UniProtKB/Swiss-Prot annotation:
EC number of the protein: 1.14.-.-
Annotated protein name in UniProt: Cytochrome P450 720B2
PROSITE patterns: CYTOCHROME_P450 (PS00086)
Tree of life domain: Eukaryota
Annotated keywords: Heme, Iron, Membrane, Metal-binding, Monooxygenase, Oxidoreductase, Transmembrane, Transmembrane helix
SUPFAM superfamilies named among the record's database cross-references: Cytochrome P450 (SSF48264)
Recorded family membership: Belongs to the cytochrome P450 family.
A GO CC annotation given for this chain: membrane
GO biological process, one term: sterol metabolic process
Length: 487
């Protein structure tokens, strides 16, 4: 009897296996049929779709995680297909990847007309439906305008400069007392404190420490496998989002309860706008907190890493800042003004090179609103995704000689911002209607940080550290360093 049951069980298992095999074969044929039918109507860019469903996603992430050559995925396909090629990434079988600088510029400049932002749904779910990556049309223009207004020249040159330098003096004194620090983690908290002050009028406290910790989980979830099971990075990201939104709503309720209190922050200004609901405001503030501290904090720790590995650049940077201090009378804790900041020419070179090599925003997603013709007579059909892969051009030897080398001197002939904005092979802040509104703030934060850090400290690396670009650019060990006061 036992033998009969076993035989029956084995037969059932064999049948189930056969059915799965047949079903898999049929799905593969259906995939090829649908793909073939959609492809035959157009002269699509050349490329490969990889495996069904997963496509080339694993190969893409394996490539960008290479510390030796983060362009590996692109390089192999560019040699085979050219700078604009078809792929199958992030669950999207109808996607074209571009590392063509001129085409990338065209895509970004024609937002709203020929293209519109269309990020993967798991990412949009985390960011929120009213985050700047998710919204379109009039609402996008209004929210983008609110961010631009917050960061207008008058506020940057006075309020932000004052707040950044006050916070730097307090923070660097704490680092001096600690002596041994993980710079990446400390910079995250530093910039989060600044953004929390400007957006929510929150001073450094246990609240801002908890917010910074939550953003760590939130960031990890953005490119995690989108499975919302307890314990996964994606699930932790949603829990972090709930916590962060709750904190923002608490600030909103506090303003409602105490209308007489004076707050010079963005939240107060948004609450006075009749056109913005509390849900829109909460998602928008969450996005700005994330975007405003992510690039700036990473650029600070990456800049110190690059300078540590390039003593010649560090010495030239120190000389520039020491000369500025001397011009200002070598007064202790002397604050810089806007003209001082503008005078730091080599510092600007260091900033641009840090942004180029660091690649803190690797790419942007756009959906075609009409059929798009590309060079070579190829067509990207309406409704397809274009992935503008900025890392692909930033680290391309055709546009930047010795592209993997940190070389700030390469920027000396190109220091005017307007000239840099016209360079399609260098777009660390995107472009067009969605040009990052915090571009000038991020550069100023990094310049003021470098000024205070290199004039106050000498340092040594406690461990050798390397850069990983997966799931986002980071220093694997967090850049542990030992600080000493300069004599």
């Amino acid at each position: 009897m036992g033998s009969g049951i076993m035989t029956e069980t084995l037969t059932d298992s064999w049948l189930v296996g056969l059915l799965c095999l047949v079903l898999g074969f049929l799905l593969l044929q259906l995939y090829k049929l649908v793909w073939g039918a959609s492809s035959r109507a157009y002269k699509l860019p050349p490329g490969s779709t990889g495996w069904p469903l997963i496509g080339e996603t694993i190969s893409f992430f394996r490539g960008i995680n290479s510390t030796a050559q983060p362009r590996q995925f692109i390089q192999e396909r560019e040699q085979r297909y050219g700078e604009i090629f078809r792929s199958n990434l992030f669950g999207r079988s109808r996607i074209v990847v571009s590392v063509d600088p001129e085409f990338n510029k065209h895509v970004l400049q024609h937002e709203g007309r020929q293209f519109q932002a269309n990020y993967p749904k798991p990412l949009r779910n985390l960011i929120g439906k009213y985050g700047l990556l998710s919204v379109h049309g009039d609402l996008q223009r209004k929210l983008h305008g609110a961010a631009v207004n917050l960061l207008r020249f008058e506020r940057l040159s006075v309020d932000f400069m004052e707040d950044i330098q006050n916070l730097l003096h307090i923070t660097l004194a704490k680092w001096e007392a600690k002596r041994d620090i993980h710079l990446q983690e400390e910079c995250h908290q530093l910039v989060l404190n600044l953004m929390a002050k400007q957006l929510l009028d929150l001073s450094p406290s246990k609240d801002t420490e908890e917010i910074c910790e939550a953003f760590g989980h939130f960031s990890e979830a953005l490119l995690a496998v989108p499975i919302k099971i307890p314990g996964t990075k994606y699930a932790r990201g949603f829990k972090a989002r709930e916590f962060l939104i709750k904190k923002i709503y608490e600030s909103i309720e506090d303003r409602r309860q105490h209308p007489e209190a004076v707050h010079n922050d963005l939240l107060t200004k948004l609450l006075k706008e009749d056109s913005f609901s509390e849900e829109i405001i909460a998602d928008f503030i969450l996005f700005l907190l994330f975007a405003g501290h992510e690039t700036s904090s990473r650029s600070m720790s990456f800049a110190i890493k690059f300078l540590t590995d390039c003593p010649r650049a560090l010495e030239e940077l120190k000389a520039e800042h020491d000369a500025l201090l001397k011009r200002k009378g070598n007064l202790k804790n002397q604050k810089l003004n806007w003209d001082d900041y503008q005078s730091l020419k080599f510092t600007q070179c260091v900033i641009h090179e840090t942004l180029r090599v660091g690649n803190f925003g690797p790419g942007v997603f756009r959906e075609t609103k009409e059929d798009i013709k590309t060079k070579g007579g190829f067509v990207i059909p309406r409704g397809w995704t274009v992935y503008v892969f900025l890392t692909g051009t930033h680290l391309d030897e055709k546009y930047h000689s010795s592209a993997l080398k940190f070389d700030p001197w390469r920027w000396q002939p190109h220091l005017q911002d307007q000239e840099l904005l016209k360079n399609p092979s260098f777009m660390p802040f995107g472009g067009g209607a969605r040009l990052c509104p915090g571009m000038h703030l991020a550069k100023m934060e990094l310049a003021l940080f470098l000024h205070n850090f290199v004039t106050k400290f000498r340092w040594e690396a406690l461990q050798d550290d390397k850069i990983s670009y997966f799931p986002f650019p980071r220093l694997i060990k967090g850049l542990p360093i030992r600080l000493r006061l300069r004599e």
